[in-house]
Amino acid sequence: MVTVTGGAIHHFAGFRADRDALALRSAILRVTARVTGWEAVLRVRCSKGLVLEAQHGHFFVRAADLLALPTVDSDSTFAVQVRVEDLSAAQSASLQAALLYTTSKGERRIRVFTVALPICTTLAPLYRSVDGDAVAALTAKMAAKKALDAKVADAREALSNKLVDVLSVYRASFSTPQTPPSQLVLPDALRSYPLHTLGIIKHPAFRAGADVDADRRVALMAHLRTGSVDAILSELSPRLFDLQQVPDSVADTAIVPPTLNLSSEKLTNSTVYVLHAGTRAVVWLGRGADPQLLGGILGDLQGRPLDANLVAGFSLPRLPYAASVRLNGLLDALALDVGRFVPVSLVLEGDPAAAVFSESMVEDRSGGAASYFEFLVAIQKQIQEKVKR
């Protein structure tokens, strides 16, 4: 229903009031307080020589360039794919989106967005000016559409093929005779594109196996179809922090500190890690962590053992200890950065619930998928074969 009415899905797996009540309350408050438009229509137009090929988001398609939106809100994102047919005689190309809607006060309004872009005759300026983050987000939306229209396996295959197509054209156009055949040649603007593509393939929405239930998979795909560029990238490449490396000033400055690579190779069980993956945050407690550090985060457990049962329903307190101040300061900075409440779950090293942490280590081999290094090697071989044809 939400896919044609402009709505959204909020998924609370195995709902527990002691764990999820705050997240549910926050979601309800945001839905009722955010700016919302009603009975809206969105028309997208483009210059002669450009053709609208596909649309992504939650809406009802009235025509190729006209989308009906029973509701539209400030959290909604829509994307369109434009195909170039013939721009040989033009010097610029224009795109325009017009949104007609009714406000909650009953006022009928229209918002118009217009962009004019220069036309290049060579590939160099195109690859130099491409928005790599937008490309990755659109790729995720295309994969979600492919999975819904066909199969998840088809979406994974299409992701690899798309990456090979983009990079093989670049290599064929810009590599030199001195470039080693085994070297992966990447444009600067798309250096993160292979990692983001692997992040999509390993994302629970597309991951192979029966460990992801249907409800979660559908909810995640809905989020990808309607998410903003920043929201999608935070899902594909979560941010990982070592709490002991987070500065004490984070509570005062609200500045998000540098992140770690998404690989377990250099992780240790003697600390506490914080993983931020867009709509959720995970606090991973190492079993070898300093008891003083754990006590500063959890407080006095009154003799209760630190195990999975305790952690599962634990509500993170705000304590006057350095570790608690740093942790809550970091979580507050992350929430401020994404502009919304971020539900936090605690997991203990080695427990089944910690799988939510390990599955976000995109650079590792996991779930039957290759590591980042293995993925790059496989992609490079496919590029070599494609360029030789």
Map each language-model feature to its residues:
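Extended acidic, low-complexity intrinsically disordered regions
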Residues: M1-R389
